[in-house]
Amino acid sequence: MIQVLTNNPLEARFSFFPAPVNNKKPSKVMTLKDAFGYITGMQARERTQALRRIGDKKEARAYKGTHFDYVTFSGEFSYGADDKLIRHSGLLCVDFDHVADVAKVKEMLLGDDYFDTQLLFTSPSGDGVKWVVAIDLSQCDHRTWFKALANYVRASYGLVADPSGINVSRACFLPHDALVYVNSNVCPF
């Protein structure tokens, strides 16, 4: 049985890994509030702008992998691998790559009636969306939640989720996004 620290997204904890992506040793534990601060802060602003100026896909992928810090939204890890999960956060990050209209996708997901968005931001490349939602692991496991959510967004919105999100240790690169959405329960303003 996977240990879950809490079912309260406010208390969810997950691992932070400094770049590059082949670094599998986390340096600290973060919260959604910490991730919001990082994404809206200046840590990744220059590298996000630089990545978006790169025209070659292969070069852009290499740049992202060497320059961007990342988190594992679904939990705390002793090492960046599924079998090194310490505890699940109760969060799931769904990645939508190469969408035609980022603003429209964000609007649809924020208006969803079934899933309460915890964090929503534009991907480092600028043409994708990262959607972090709370899941209840007492109902089913991480992989089943991912499959259900992927099927749901495809049927409801015609969106295709990146299938790698099925892995609990999936890396999520942290870009700069001044327009990131954070649930008001996480950061009340």
Language-model regions, residue ranges each:
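Short, glycine-/Ser/Thr-/acidic-enriched flexible segments
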Residues: 99, 179, 188
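Helical (often loop-to-helix) elements that flank the catalytic cores of nucleotide-handling enzymes
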Residues: 105-108, 135-159, 182-189
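Residue-level detector of short coil/turn "hinge" positions at structural boundaries
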Residues: 116, 160-161
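Short, conserved secondary-structure transition motifs
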Residues: 132-138, 163-185
